[in-house]
Amino acid sequence: MNLKEEILQKTNRGLEVFYFYMPIEFVPKRNFRNPLYDDKRASCNIYFDTQSQCYRMKDFGNEAYSGDCFWFTAAILGFDVRTEFIKVLTSIIHDLGLNIPIKERKTSE
């Protein structure tokens, strides 16, 4: 199993990652203001995407601020999810106290 999938398995398909890093309280499937920019309307929510089998954030006001828990973690921590993906994974494992060894493994973005 790859590291990304193992994180998803241990975090309720990414929902716990959103709960940990989200600087505001939210309820899945309920709209809130996006904390990543000065959002004027509550048009953002966290939902379970059946196609990818994980939780995702969707911002209907600004599509550029939508993505999965790995994208969101990168945005919060100031990482580039494409070039620093392993940093994102190791940050999640460390910050959430997941019992996942981080040796040389497949990350599978």
Regions inferred by a protein language model and the residue ranges of each:
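N-terminal structured subdomain of primase-like DNA metabolism proteins
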Residues: 1-109
